[in-house]
Amino acid sequence: MLSRQERKRKVKVQFLGAHNCESATTRLVSILVDDILALDAGGLTSSLPIESQLDLKAVLLTHHHYDHIRDIPALGMNALFYETSVSVYATQAVRDALASHWLNGIIYVNFLEKPPESPRIQFTVIEPNRAFTVAGYEILPVPVNHSAPTVGYQVTAPDGKTLFYTGDTGPGLAEAWPFTSPQLLITEVTAPNRFEEFGRRMLHLTPSLLKEELLAFQKQKGYLPQVVLVHMNPRQEKEIDAEVKQLSSELGTSITLAYEGMVIQL
């Protein structure tokens, strides 16, 4: 049984990067849970001081596209200099992509294997729909629909509070709903509604496509979670924001755009 203090504890969710393009004011997607679990690595080293990087217990990667894995080499180099290692969890497809294209000894040092006696990236291959535990948090990888093999992660804190981060996804996200029941849903909206055909073709969401998935969630689960959106195109963000506000009003639930530095207490 949880103590009273544990029941009152808040789960901290910090958005280090919230966009699909990087600039002086926007970063690629990375989300930090309770300062120790990182969801994707688009904006980790550019956002966190070394001390905070060393506090990470795990980096969970959804898929192998550049904007989600970019900082893995830099994390490996920092781990080398500070004589430690970083634990990375992802599918075999992600490991293969890192090893062949990114940490291949040509673009950057292969920290998956070097130094031989103690590789700086300790990589654990995960299986979709097979839960595992990191630092007391239960992690469930759930397949989602995207142009590369992708899993979202349901993260359940020791006190039972739950979030689900989809990573990049398009129409068909409802196939994940039977496996997850979050209080907080972190998903993507890449473009405004006028790009719906693009979203269907490239497997990304617009507000109108998100609406279809949320209605399916509500039908299956009987409720709607708090929703926070990432992976926005900065050029179209004002248009996306207006459409998301309308969607939030229509569905009667909190749906907001994330921003760099945003913190939610769950």
Predicted regions and their residues:
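Metallo-beta-lactamase
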Residues: 94-150, 157-158, 254-264
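Active-site neighborhood of phospho(di)ester-bond hydrolases with catalytic His/Asp-centered motifs
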Residues: 38-42, 57-67, 89-91, 164-169, ...
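Conserved beta-strand hairpin/beta-sheet module of binuclear metal-dependent hydrolase folds
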Residues: 8-52, 151-167
